[in-house]
Amino acid sequence: SKAFELIDHNALRRKFNDYGFPPQLSLWMLAFLSRRNQFVKVGGCVSAVMRSHAGAPQGTRAGPNVFKLLINDLSFQLPTIKYVDDVSVVSVASDPNDQTLQKAVASLIDWSNRNGLRMNNDKTKELTIIYFGRRHLVSDVPELTVGGISIERVCSFKVLGVIISQDLTWKEHVLYIVSKACKRLFIIYQLIRSGISVADVIAIYCSLIRSVLEYCSPVWHC
């Protein structure tokens, strides 16, 4: 949600022009996004009204599309996985001192600065996988840095709900989803005790538990 709040309207205006949007459509979209008033209401208390000078309203169909338009030109000479405000960059190298990925990180920072966005350092991780003979150790690979600060190196990381481990096994992911499903089984138990119908129990099971166990199963169930 934070990323949606940081959409720079001036950067968006440039994107509209770069992609050849009709002037009328560009003006209409910018008018929809700009000068929006907002306030917070809790019970009978209402905060002062503030005007938003950036961002896109959430809960609208236009919001996600506007954000995708903003990040559409974010690309590198490396495989890049983008999903809304999540970006993963992948590099394969035979030399542990290869600087390709570090250059991609620098390009990402430069792109973010030009487009009025900022990278969340707390959520930015480095996952290094050594394979094919394991002639090198992870410690042989220089750490990636952002502004002179090292990016945290982890042994596993969750990408779109799937935990990828350094050893290329799915043990951690399987333990994670089994634990998550077991916690939700308690809900089923309580519903059965309350006398809910079997059909409703099955529907809730499929929605809350089976969906967790089957999510991306073609990837990790191998």
Where are these regions (language model features)?
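Conserved pre-catalytic core of RNA-dependent polymerases
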Residues: 1-57, 91-92
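Structural preference for long, well-ordered alpha-helical segments in enzyme cores
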Residues: 16, 29, 70, 74, ...
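Short, residue-level hotspots on alpha-helical faces of the histone-fold
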Residues: 31, 68-72, 207-215
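Active-site palm subdomain of RNA-directed nucleic acid polymerases
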Residues: 64-91
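Inter-domain linker/hinge segments that demarcate the starts of reverse transcriptase
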Residues: 98-116, 182
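Short, conserved non-catalytic motifs in the polymerase core
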Residues: 4, 40-66, 90-94, 153, ...
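Short, conserved micro-motifs composed of acidic
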Residues: 44-45, 93, 103-106, 118-155
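Basic, alpha-helical interaction scaffolds
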Residues: 81, 148-220
